């Protein structure tokens, strides 16, 4: 029997497949599209996702296909410098098209043995105490121990579960288009600069091969959220910029709204939700793909532990407990950003005030930490300030921390050399390293790099190990 069915082969599902296969979990990804995605809605990775790629040994692949930027302005386009003191070894944004991210994650998952079936869509599901039966659109049935819905904002899995998806409806729509233009680039650049003095939901950037990615406010709401036509794009360009730049030969046309919705629960028995199936929000700040990757990084090791038989009773539930509040905060900050992009007098007055505030380094850093997810700290109870945070990559006597965590296991980083994980050594590595660049005597790290315990007392460590790594063997 399959261990895990993943419905959806986008970045979240592919990341999760790699995480599960790292632990030997038999994984099948079902993707309804018959061929790989050729268009990139998202175009970058933030620091936390870059850390994830480093921790899994994938970063060099991504760096080879992306470009590093240290530029501010990610919060509602407010002009700001990139902070110099972010708590990460990867203090930059990696510009990389989503289509490349998906290709690299596909390569990683399949190298580890994940099976990806295209042209397959979940149409029904039934679960019992032992597993989940998924019915595909062609009538085929598959049985697995767990199923994870990574099938996007219009998730079939979420609908079949009957999970509520409360939130705010779309009030404004924006068109995205990769097109060619019939005017000089200098003309396009000049018009964009002039229009953006008042309309910040308008923009144009090179998209490769002579194409430009245009971002244009829609004129009203669509009835069915269907992709716009070239004629609609031209009308919206005329309404916003007074010209359509002679756009032609579109290779991609899409639209997005400013709706924000959050699934009421991420787990229903043996079925879980991740990525856009669990939360949707506007793309302001470029957080959506990154949020899904981090969902997968949180869930993967926990699901593997449940399948491996060593998961503590509440470990799978901690996925919802930890990731649901993170998504709620992202929904809040994207709502705030959309408000700051409004043309109405009230929001524009607030924007002018915010433009003054981001000149303060602490305010600027706070906003960037939100966008990049560096500020995320899971509520793991009382204790040292490090508990619940992801530990940045640090130098060790030999090598780096993230290099030591590429196997997806827990790690006791012990500067004292006096501690032991005997009884958990099949799940937790012990590195006694007095030269580690760590400001505490010892730290217990979960497989996702978050600090579960800090201290130097063996009895206290033994009291905390079972919470995340189950009973001793």
Swiss-Prot record:
Traits of the deletion mutant: No visible effect on rifampicin resistance.
Catalytic activity: rifampicin + NADPH + O2 = rifampicin para-naphthoquinone carboxamide + NADP(+) + H2O + H(+); rifampicin + NADH + O2 = rifampicin para-naphthoquinone carboxamide + NAD(+) + H2O + H(+)
Family assignment from sequence similarity: Belongs to the rifampicin monooxygenase family.
Record function comment: Monooxygenase that can modify rifampicin, thereby inactivating its antibiotic activity. It constitutes a secondary rifampicin resistance factor.
Binding site for FAD: 12, 31-32, 41, 98, 122, 156, 276, 289-290
Domains: entry comment: Contains three domains: a FAD-binding domain, a middle domain, and a C-terminal domain. The middle domain forms a cap over the FAD-binding domain and is involved in binding rifampicin.
Signal peptide: none
Cofactor: FAD
Residues reported in the UniProt entry to bind rifampicin: 43, 196, 285
Gene name in the database record: rox
Record protein name field: Rifampicin monooxygenase
The protein's assembly and partners: Homodimer.
Superkingdom, taxonomy of origin: Bacteria
